[in-house]
C-alpha cells in the first residue's frame, strides 16, 4: 500500500523576486545528482512527476532511478508509471468517458457511498469540435447554417455532455462553435506550471486525440492515449509507458523570405519519417529556435503523429513567455512559470552556452534550406517542392496505383470533361481542385500563415483574380481569436470575395467533415473517373479521408491553399505558368500575389492583440443560444433513457459488492476466436460505418432507426449495446475457426454453427461458458481504442493468450479485468498443437497476494495438453485492478473506503 513520499526532503519554497513565496516544489537540483544535467528537458518532466507522486505503491523509488539513469535504461524498453497533470477530451471520445463516470456514480450510490465522490481527480477539459460539417460554404451565413445542422444531428450527445459539465466538478466543457480542442488548449487551457494548493509542478496532459501533441510547442508534455487510460488518469491512476528514447533535432539559421511554418513542418515530417522516431520523443534545440515563433513551434509539434513520434517537444524559453503574455496569461502567472522552470532546470536560455544534454540520436536542419512545398497526394510525409509539383503530378498520373500513383492511361491524362454548372458550361480535368480548405489547428493557430493567406487574397482581388464558383472553398478557424484579428486587419473581406468565408469553428474538412461537393461536379468526377484534387491546410491526407471523391489530397500552407484555389488545379508550375488573368487582361503569376515576410510581420504586429484573446476566452464556456436552450436535468445522477440509441447505461457494475471478487482463474473455456498475427484494434472494434447485415444494424432497425441514420460506430460509442455488437465486426477480420473464410463470424464449437461473433458469444454466455481468445504477435496494435478492451469484456472474454501485445492495448485489457497471457518464446498455438477447439483452464491462486507480476501460469486443455504462459500483469497496481475486477471497480471501492 501507499506510504509517505521518500523525497519530501527535497521539497523547497520558491521565492518571489519581490519577497514572499510562490509555493513549494520538488527541487531537482536538490537531488545533487549530476545525471540531471544530461537529461533531455522532456525527460526531466517525467522525472519530476515520478518524484512528486512517489508513494512506493503506484510510483516507486526504483521508477525514479530508472528515469534518472535514462541514458542507460532507455535503450532497454523499461516501463515506468506516469501521472499526467490533466486530461483533454474531444466530443467523439468524451461521450464514452462521461458515460463511464455517470455509471460509476450510480454504482457508488447503489453501494451506499457518496456518488459525488465520483469526480475527476485531475482537471479535465472537453472541447466539442468534431461534429460540425461544411454543409454550407461560400456564404457569409455559413457559420450559422452549419451550426444549426450540427445541433440538429447531435442534440442528444450535446445534451448529455452539457449535463456532464454541470454534474461533475473539475470538468470544463467548451461548447460547440468555440474552436478546435488543440488550439483552445494552446491559447487558453494550458497552465505550463500548475500551482495547486501551494504546490508547484509542470503542466502535462494526455488527450484522447492524437494531435494533443500540439501543446508540446508550449513546453507542456502531452500526447494522445486511449479512452481507458484517459479515464484512469482522471481518477488518479498512473499510466504505464515505456521510457522513451529522445531524438535531438537541432535547428540552425533562419527561414528565407517567403517561407512558411507549413513548409518547415512538412520538411521536418519527411526528415523524421526517414529517420524513424516511432515510440520516441523528439526534442528541438539549437540557435535556430530563436527564429521560430511559438505558433511555428506548435505547428511542428502538432504533426508529431504524422512523423511518428510520441512528442515533438520544445522546452520553455523567452519566446514561450512572450506568447503567454500575448494570449492573456497574467504577469504574475508568467513570472511564476519562469521562476519555477529556471529553479528546476527546465528553462532554456538561448543566450547562454548550450547545455550538456545527451540524446539517443541526433538530426540537424538549417532553416535556410527549407523551400516552398506541399505534401501528397496520399500521405503527409510525401513532401513535394513547389518547383517540382507539376512534374510530380504527371508522374503520379503515370505511376501504378500506390501512394504516389493513379495509373491513368497517357491518352486520358489531358482529357477535359464538360459539365453544366448552374446553367453554364464548365470543364474539369485530372488534377483540378474541387475542395480548397483553410482548416485545422495545425495552421489556423498560426497568425503568420493565416494573415499571409489573407494578404494573398487581397493582392489577388486587387488584380482582378477570382476562384471558380464550383470549387468548395472554406475557412474554419480553430478559435474566435482568428476572426478578431482577420477583422482588425481589414483583410477578411478579401477572403470572403474569393469564397473563403468562415464556415464554422471546428475540425471540419481536416477530419473528413467536408460536406458534399456540388452534384454536377460530383457526377463529372464519377462518370469520367477523374482524379480530382483537394488542397487543405490540414495534417492528414490519406485517400478517402478528406472526401470520397478527391483521390489526390495535398497538405499546404493557408496562403498556398488560396493560390491553388485561384489556379484551379495542382497541374501547374507556379514559376513559369500564370495563376490567372487580371482585370486588365494581363497574366498574373504566383510571385505577383505572394507577400514578403516583412509584409506579413507588419500585419501580424498591428492586428494580433492580447485583448482579443482575453475577450474570446472570457466567454468560452457560455456557448451560443442553441447550447443555452438545451434543457438538461439538474441532478448529479444521470437519468438514463432506455430508448436512446446514442447514450446507454453500461453494465460494468451490475451486481457489484463492496468485497472485491478476487482473482479468478478460467475453467473449461471455449476459444471464441483463433487469430494469427497483427490483429489491430480496428479489427477488434471498427470505428467506421455500420454494415446493413451486422448485429448492430439489426439492433438499430429493431428500435426504428432508419438505415440512413445508422451513423458510425464512432458516433455511437456512448451505447454499449451497439459497441458490443460491433466488437470483432470488421469485415476484413481473419479467424482460423472459419478455415479461410474472411469476415466477422465464428464457429460455436459445441454445435458447429457458424454465427456472428456477437451471437456466438451470447450463446456461450447463455450456456454458462467462459471464453478466451488465441492470437499471434502484436495483438491490439494500431489506434489505442478503449472499446477494443471494453467490447471483448462485454462479450464474456476472460483471457487473451497471444505471442505479444501492443503496449496500450495490454494495459486496456488489464483495466477491464481481462487476463493477458503470453506464450513462451518460440511457442504459439501452432507449435503447441492447439486447434482452438479445446476447452481451456487457466490456473490462478484465489488470493491476489499469492500472484506476482510477470509470473508463470499453467494452461491446461481438456485433451491433456499443458503449457506455460507469462502472466502480463506487469505491476502490483495492475494486480490490484484484477483483484477488483477492473480499474473502475477498484476506484469505486477505494473512494467509498476513504
Swiss-Prot record:
The keyword Transport does not apply. GO terms for cellular component: apoplast; cytosol; mitochondrion; plant-type vacuole; plasma membrane; plasmodesma. Its EC number is 4.2.1.3. The keyword Iron applies. Disulfide bonds: none annotated. It is found in: Cytoplasm; Mitochondrion. GO terms for biological process: citrate metabolic process; isocitrate metabolic process; response to iron ion starvation; tricarboxylic acid cycle. Its cofactor is [4Fe-4S] cluster. This is Aconitate hydratase 1. The gene is ACO1.
